[in-house]
Amino acid sequence: MREVTTAKSAGFCFGVRRAVDMVYAEAKKDNRVFTLGPIIHNEQVVKDLEKKGVKVIDSVNDISEKENTTIIIRSHGVPQNVINALKEKKVNIVDATCPFVSKIHKIVKQASEDGKTVVIVGSDNHPEVEGIKGWCVSKPIVIESASEAEKLDNFGGKKLCIVSQTTFNYKKFKDIVDILSKKSYDIDVMNTICNATEERQTEAGTIARQSDAMLVIGGKHSSNTQKLYEICRKECENTYFIQTLDDLDLQQFQSFRSVGITAGASTPNNIIKEVQSYVRNE
């Protein structure tokens, strides 16, 4: 029988579990329920919620009826102006923003009000980063690579406040901070990478290093799953990114005696178990 090692940290993190539970709870009520963007980056969960009457909207402008309407803010969070727009609509607001993300909103708001330049380490077009940018009172700088950090110019003596997308690669964040520190900037470094993310990345790398092949399970739009794939790929050449069991070609695994499995923060446990059972028993 093939040896299969599944990461203990694989699957829903605290913030995602909290957000998903909140949506399912609202779906049981009589109100019309909408999420502002997909609640998490997992197609299976979003489709299941749709069956229960929960619809996805892309913008506050998509709200046509206000009475008996509940709008759920997803775990990634939103800019402050979106919160204000929802309040003006007078709809019922359920804020499922991850508490770790909400903490970043407070940090950047205060730092920018104090006159500091906010540097966000993360993917500029990721919804979490879009939300963080929207809590800065002055324009922040977003970087996601060491080369971008090298190109940053002097800020005229202004103090920098550095934060990170919660799901960013910890090693890359540290490398970027090291580069900015060597430029002699006056900086406040706030390591806002979620502990669960750091633990997940470390464990995934360790398992990949010890396995003949590695499976990374998660939504194709999931940033944290993509980062897991990058980490595992560096440690194990035979690393595969799948969303569900349907994406798995077991013919690729015939010669592998040991297979590691990890999953992104938006991957339900039932999908992980299904893949684990199939790989172990085939």
Give, region by region, the residue ranges found by the protein language model.
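The feature marks the mature, well-folded catalytic cores of soluble enzymes
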Residues: 1-282
